[in-house]
């Protein structure tokens, strides 16, 4: 085995041990009794093809490269053809960026070369009073509802993101799996479940791309999501689990794509964002036939996910406005607007009331 492969294996082992020691120290510092981290001995590390010694570009062909591989007798250079569309994507989006050594990757019993690039990006430092945010509600009936909001509660734009055909395809696959499992059992349906998960992952990619694209078009400084509990096992039907996994994947992908554009990511408490009406009238009543719509206690008909996106953006600004204030000034504002004390029940109407109260205090 070449020394370069041995060096990569040693570096991977050092990184795994260092990560384990860090997690163990954090676990001891928190004083927890359960969830003690452990060192996984089987890492399944893939080899790294270092430049010039294990990997070389093909100067004669654009979509080809040379890899040093073992043919049973010795290590020799072999020409490998790369997919034209993948190489065009790299040339279009990553030309001029610092490229790291490619790594071998195995997915679905196939091997791929994973190319990694390094890029320095500075996140924006826009003050809260000048920020424009994109609050996102990841729903069930509608994939995502985005609202562009200013600190005073002004709504600059709204967008409904929904890939209905992709969801219908996935739900048809789930229906076939359910009928198949009734006849043959769940053990023989693993391949079908893997296909459903791949459809779910692809749907998450599309939704995340649309969210970041819309936030970038509207020049948003922050994308605000609900905080989703990421620990523990998920209970419920497999369909519900797929929806939760997709929401987690969307938030993760949005964070990665938004940071490349200098956009920050923030999360707020998810309690009651969909249950409470944005106008402060109280709990909503969802329609039994069309779950996208609801009725406020005032009799107003509105979209549930759009109301939730208003509340998500309002909670972000309430938190960011009150957090840097001195304790005395914050207490006076909370006395005038008692609803902002509990972040689990704040709605869009409370933000408007808080802003008006702050303006009155400035005028006085």
Positions of PLM-derived features:
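Nucleic-acid substrate recognition interfaces
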Residues: 1-364
